[in-house]
Amino acid sequence: MSKSGELRVPVLPSRTRRRLVHGGFIAIALLYVGVLVIAPLIGIAWAAISAGWSTIVSTLRQPDVLHAFYLTGVITIVTVIVTSIFGVIVALVIARDRFAGRALMSALVDLPLAVSPVIVGLMAVVLFGLGGWFEPWFTSHGIRILFALPSMVLVTIFICIPFVIREVVPVLQEVGITEEEAARTLGASSLQTFFRVTLKNIRWGLLYGIALTTARSIGEIGAVLIVSGQITGQTETATLYVLRAFDQFQDDPGFVVALTLALVSIVLLVLIETFKRRHERMQRT
């Protein structure tokens, strides 16, 4: 207390205040990751392991589970290939070209992220279902889209297409066109320029987009549930198997398959991030 009788509150130095604020932000981030990411994963892992190794092995050997993993793999592979090709093309158009409607195209790219997957599935039903816009043509040619693999692939591609685009566009904007113009000046064709210059510059963005696409494709359930019919042993993906397992109170097999899917996605993302950081360190040295 001062001589005048006023109570003075001690003021922390600015550096100390910054450290406290910084530490608080770190604590909040760790709490967020721990509660919303790590804790659920630990819970699933604990539930799966608690079922016993015999249950884990027997679950992973079930024909329905094996077919579900196979179908998930097929959908994921096709989705990755298609979204990578068209994603890079769209990213090049958005990053390099100037035309009327470019802003609208850039906004529409994010539409699959804003629309519920269930709505995406219903859109597919409107287009390819009984009485749908395109159903008569496909039916007349003996092609089945709805409640079959094609519709499952289509909705998954629609949902996953933004990931490659949004990872590649910033990279293209950052690197610019100087190297590409230099390659053309030296006589390189458009294809040579793309494969030797452009693709080399965007490879890490593309790989990370592919990793996100893979993880999203593996975990997709809403749209696939609508268009697949969830026929066991035919149109049931791994995530749909998990849903059916819990609906039928078969919790242990559901936890085992769920943990397997989670581990695949986590390992893939960690590997991509590790290689990316190693490459960045090599470039700096």
Regions found by a protein language model. Give the residues of each.
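Transmembrane-helix boundary motif in ABC transporter permease subunits
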Residues: 11, 16-17, 56, 78-109, ...
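C-terminal transmembrane helix and the adjacent membrane-cytosol boundary/short C-terminal tail
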Residues: 2-3, 7, 24-28, 169-184, ...
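Transmembrane alpha-helices and adjacent helix-loop boundaries
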Residues: 114-121
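Interhelical loop and adjacent transmembrane-helix boundary motif
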Residues: 19, 56, 60-63, 224-270
